[in-house]
A protein has these predicted regions:
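Glycosyltransferases and closely related glycan-assembly transferases
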Residues: 140-152
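Conserved phosphate/ATP/ADP-binding segment of small-molecule kinases
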Residues: 148-151, 158-227
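Glycine-rich phosphate/adenosyl-contacting loop at the front of the ribokinase-like
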Residues: 1-61, 66-70, 77, 304
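Short, acidic/turn-prone active-site loops that include or flank metal/cofactor-
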Residues: 11, 63-64, 111-114, 156-161, ...
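Conserved N-terminal subdomain of the carbohydrate kinase-like
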Residues: 27-29, 51-131, 148, 290-304
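Structural detector of well-ordered beta-strand residues that form the stable sheet scaffold
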Residues: 5, 57, 133, 153-155, ...
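Conserved phosphate-binding/catalytic region of the ribokinase-like
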Residues: 5, 193-304
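Active-site glycine-rich loop that binds ribose-phosphate moieties when present
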Residues: 114-122, 134-137, 155, 159-166
């Protein structure tokens, strides 16, 4: 059976909500709202995709600690097969504690970069997938996968100092690239989405530019297509929206849908994500997604 897959670090978020203020040094403040959830990144994308009924695999790093055990449980509940490639003896997952006040969010994070995972391990774990979410590293892995016939999709997220030259090797491998507005402007050197799409068309056949609340612009066979965002969603927390969009987009690819339908699915899953605090808290099942896609089919505007 066809499956989707991706390699990336697992993130676990501890969310302290409804805080009136941050504590001063030496103080302790209590809140009555706390949640523990999976954070963003490729494993989070696979969880949202698994909840849509797609068979998927996340290649990641887990250790023998309570946070890794929590993540493992979340993967299994979503129907995601975890493949552990961690070889160390520390806590392998990234952990973020977020203090959420009325005006802002403040973070304290832990991350362990120590690991000896090899490109061959990652390739062997991803081999055979119909579609793979690309990591910012290991271009040789994705080149081999593409040569195998796997569709490879790049969504890097914002990285300080990112340039088109730095991402050239990955873009030349990717079948699809999913930058948001900020990433698009930095990489293309223009604030005009149409011109940016033409810049990206030198690397990918069908450029896609995410325009945040304005939807997504597709440049397909010389035609611009706008897929509008979903107006009914009320934003509570935008964290994880890009990862959720990626899941909806992958759902469409896994079902051989036209690219504009893939983007519509992405707008729906990404829009749903922002209606609750946390990267993987708010989501649709497959039936709900298809109902929403039918309801908003006219959000696809051709010859834009």
């Amino acid at each position: 059976m066809a499956f989707a897959a991706g390699y990336g670090k697992t993130n676990v978020d501890l969310l302290f909500e409804n805080m009136s203020r941050l504590p001063n040094e030496g103080e302790e403040i209590f809140t009555d709202r706390f949640s523990l959830c999976l954070g963003g990144g490729i494993p989070g994308t696979m969880v949202t995709l698994g909840r849509l009924g797609v068979e998927c695999k996340t290649v990641t790093e887990l250790s023998k600690d309570m946070f890794s055990e929590f993540a493992l449980g979340e993967f299994r509940k979503a129907g995601v097969e975890p493949v552990n490639v961690y070889h160390g003896d520390k806590i392998a997952v990234n952990i973020t504690a977020a203090a959420i006040t009325p005006n802002d969010r403040t973070f304290v994070s832990y991350g362990n970069e120590e690991n000896s995972v090899t490109a061959d391990e990652v390739y062997n774990a991803l081999k055979g997938a119909k579609a793979v979410a690309m990591h910012a590293d290991l271009p040789e892995v994705y080149k081999k996968l593409k040569n195998d016939g796997t569709t490879v999709i790049l969504d890097t997220g914002f990285i300080e100092g990112m340039t088109l030259e730095k991402y050239k090797d990955l873009l030349e491998i990717a079948d699809y690239f999913l930058p948001n507005r900020k990433e698009t402007e930095i990489l293309s050197g223009t604030s005009d989405p149409r011109q940016a799409a033409k810049v990206f068309s030198k690397y990918v056949e069908t450029p896609i530019v995410k325009l945040d609340k304005d939807g997504c612009l597709i440049y397909k066979n010389g035609e611009y297509i706008l897929v509008k965002s979903i107006d009914e969603f009320v934003r509570v927390d935008s964290t994880g929206a890009g990862d959720a969009f990626f899941a909806g987009f992958l759902y469409g690819l896994m079902h051989d849908e036209p690219i504009e339908r893939c983007v519509l699915f992405g707008n729906i899953t990404g829009g749903k994500c922002v209606t609750a605090v946390g990267c993987t808290t708010a989501y649709f099942n497959e039936e709900e997604l298809l109902e929403m896609a039918e309801k908003y089919k006219d959000n696809i505007i051709y010859n834009y």
